[in-house]
Amino acid sequence: MASAAASAVSFARPVKAICVNSVSFSALRKDNVSFRLQPVPQRFSVCCAAKKETVEKVCDIVKSQLALSDDTEVSGSSTFADLGADSLDTVEIVMGLEEAFGISVEESSAQTIATVEDAANLIDSLVGK
């Protein structure tokens, strides 16, 4: 026999979610599975923290650095690895971003960049300083 319980976590922005308060399983009877679902108010939304303009500019720079065709879709959630970038390409992307935005990215920060959104968020935080 197994059982589980969960509770909801609230955030400031809207989203539709279902909270599972109780789940139970019985080894004796397969039809003894119960769920009690409750709607949760809309409070959570996943969104890129960076400005839209920053994300778009980073997308353009990534496309240019990786010599991607114009029809290749690059968005905030695009990972450099999925776009075909290796570690050297990633270093070149960071250098291109530093030049384009007039910033300096520390090596420790550069190593945390895996997606366009990561880069845009870091850039906005550095430009704001």
Swiss-Prot record:
Residues with the O-(pantetheine 4'-phosphoryl)serine modification: 87
Keyword presence, Cytoplasm: no
SMART domains given in the database record: PKS_PP
Transmembrane segments: none
Gene Ontology MF annotations: acyl carrier activity; phosphopantetheine binding
Main location class: plastid
Pathway, per record: Lipid metabolism; fatty acid biosynthesis
Compartment list: Plastid, Chloroplast
Every Carrier domain range: 52-127
Primary role: Carrier of the growing fatty acid chain in fatty acid biosynthesis.
Family in the record: Belongs to the acyl carrier protein (ACP) family.
Name of the protein in its database record: Acyl carrier protein 2, chloroplastic
Protein species of origin: Hordeum vulgare (Barley)
